[in-house]
Design a protein with these regions (language model features):
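Membrane-integral, polyisoprenol-dependent glycosyltransferases
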Residues: 3, 11, 23-384, 568-571
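N-terminal start and proteolytic maturation junction detector
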Residues: 13-15
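Membrane-embedded architecture of ER/inner-membrane glycosylation machinery
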Residues: 204-206, 210, 324-579
Length: 579
């Protein structure tokens, strides 16, 4: 049974102890003691220092944000949308290679275009735009830390962020140029608004409204739908949320949300009612009735199968804490997190398409709840420590071995079996900067694990350091190989010499990532046969062929063809048509 002893005191206004302190005089009317926000989460002897946490954060965040071209598939088309806004300042209609792209609202693209303009003199355009991802991840981590502090006390936020870094499925997507990072940040802000609202309903409602707006302007109705379903379900889950104060809290959130999203909606409607309808009906509701076809068709129990590894170790830690806390009663703050997870899980599972990156928001409540498991030092903590140390010694050693093979080509048998066959044409590359960064991270994180008492005694700290070090090694020693296998520059840059001047080029079956990068590398915007009637007046045709199917007949002369290294699916052919 859920403990509702203190239900009558939910959503009181109390003394601010976090970043909301500056708004205290404006919003507070009365205050009571809020123990969790002021009491320490752990004894000083078991608490990881803020400096060490920041060092791990830097080691985890920076590698992967720069040093490579836009990768297929998500980064490629996202970069095309960002460049359009940077060049035209048109934030109303996201445009990809000359065509409106109404799948997502423009928040991430606008922010990334700002970073592109700001940093492109120092960084390449893709790297400069990718800084937006780092920006949103920093915001998300800060909001997660504040939520954990509200729930468990001072210092809990550090452990929640460390748990997030340890989640196996998170690092890759958290460093990519994708709108889901902005959605993730909005979800973290929204959750903090819910939890803060329990003791400060006005400011909490305002923060919830901001989080919902960020989610809406990142990926449409999906994010606010999860927050809205959470808000509607909470009164059913806990009597603490059946009060006038909670109604005021929700009303404030709605009043803050509307002015932030209406300007873009109104501008889009005024620009084109047809585009507005496409965005609303196809790219939002179409996710659930199957008409959008925005991703792979959802398989049965997709997220049931995904989360055990994707959210490890947050999922088992959160489940363990909930099981231990159920007998004594789960607080209203914890019930917010449980409800958000259930609402998100049901919403995502009911969609017609599914991808692992869609599960990113589900990590938010799990990592915050999992922080509670760090409070209790049990027999399992002692038993898991040797296993964590073993992983820390084993996995980075394997990564270093793989990195040496990629840098030197030695030993030859392993190179020929694993590298030469998987990426034909790739040559060993040694970067002194990347090698130095990998070595420095290895020494730093190894010293953290073996020399710092708090980290040495915590299996979670050891495992997080292990995942972080493996990520650093992959993004330094393995970056040349990964970039070689995922970029399109090796295909489209040679194509430039064969393209006609001052003549239109039609295209067939050309995907969104390919269209975006053709414009970036070659300055070419094709006329798609599937979209433009004028394409049939062009004398040139660029075909994207799926090698798993027979080639289509083209009445013309093959002028050029190319493909990405070791790509078993895509092949590109340029024809001069017989017209």
């Amino acid at each position: 049974m859920v403990n509702t002893k203190n239900c009558q005191s939910v959503f009181p206004v109390t003394r601010a102890t976090g970043p909301e302190r500056f708004l205290l005089r404006k919003f507070a009317s009365k205050s009571t003691t809020h123990a969790n926000a002021t009491l320490p989460f752990l004894p000083a002897s078991r608490q990881i220092s803020l400096v060490l946490c920041v060092l791990v954060f830097i080691c985890w965040l920076l590698p992967g944000l720069s040093g490579h071209e836009p990768w297929k598939p998500d980064e490629a088309y996202t970069f095309g949308l960002i460049r359009h806004i940077a060049q035209t300042s048109d934030w109303v209609v996201p445009t990809l290679a000359g065509e409106p792209f109404m799948e997502k609202p423009p928040l991430y693209f606008v922010v990334a275009s700002f970073f592109l303009r700001l940093f492109s003199p120092l960084l390449g355009e893709p790297d400069a735009a990718r800084m937006a991802t780092g920006f949103f991840i920093v915001i998300a981590c800060y909001a997660i830390a504040l939520s954990a502090r509200e729930l468990f006390g001072k210092g809990a936020g550090r452990w929640a962020v460390l748990i997030l870094f340890a989640c196996i499925g998170f690092p890759v997507r958290a460093h990519q140029m994708i709108t889901d990072t902005a959605l993730f940040a909005g979800g973290a802000i929204g959750i903090y608004g819910f939890i803060l609202g329990i003791r400060h309903h006005v400011l909490g409602g305002a923060i919830l409204g901001i989080g919902a707006a960020v989610m809406f302007l990142s990926k449409g109705l999906l994010g606010p739908g999860i927050l809205g379903l959470t808000a509607l379900t909470l009164p059913l889950m806990n009597t603490a949320f059946r009060s006038r104060r909670y109604i005021v809290f929700c009303a404030i959130a709605f009043l803050v949300f509307c002015p932030l999203v209406v300007p873009w909606l109104y501008a889009l409607w005024m620009r084109s009612e047809k585009l507005f309808s496409t965005w609303l009906l196809v790219n939002n509701f179409g996710r659930f009735d199957g008409t959008a076809k925005l991703g792979p068709k959802a398989k049965h129990f997709f997220y049931f199968k995904l989360l055990p590894w994707y959210a490890f170790p947050a999922l088992p830690m959160a489940a363990w804490w909930l099981w231990r806390s159920w007998k004594t009663g789960i607080s209203a703050s914890a019930m917010v997190l449980v409800t958000f997870f259930l609402a998100g899980f049901v919403t995502l599972s009911s969609a017609s398409d599914a991808r692992e990156l869609y599960a990113m928001p589900l990590l938010l409540p799990l990592v915050i709840l999992a922080a509670g498991a760090c409070q209790q030092k049990t027999l399992w903590t002692i038993k898991l420590r040797p296993w964590a140390l073993g992983l820390f010694c084993l996995l980075p050693t394997v990564m270093w071995g793989a990195g040496i093979i990629l840098m030197t080509g030695w030993p030859a048998p392993l190179w020929n079996k694993w590298v030469a066959q998987g990426a034909p044409g790739f040559t060993p590359q040694i970067s002194s900067v990347m090698f130095a960064a990998a070595l420095l991270a290895t020494l730093l994180l190894s010293g953290l694990v073996f020399l710092n008492r708090t980290c040495r005694e915590s299996p979670l700290s050891i495992f997080t350091s292990c995942i972080t070090l493996c990520w650093v090694l992959a993004m330094t020693l393995g970056m040349p190989y990964l970039d070689y296998t995922k970029r399109y520059s090796d295909v489209f840059l040679p194509l430039r010499a064969w393209l006609p001047k001052d003549e239109c080029v039609a295209s067939r079956h050309l995907g969104e990532p390919q269209r975006a990068l053709l414009e970036y590398y070659d300055g070419l915007i094709t006329l798609r046969e599937e979209k433009h009637r004028g394409a049939y007046r062009c004398n040139w045709l660029l075909v994207q062929h799926d090698k798993r199917h027979p080639e289509e007949f083209v009445d013309g002369t093959l002028v050029w063809q190319g493909e990405r290294p070791a790509d078993n699916e895509e092949n590109y052919q340029l024809y001069r048509l017989n017209r």
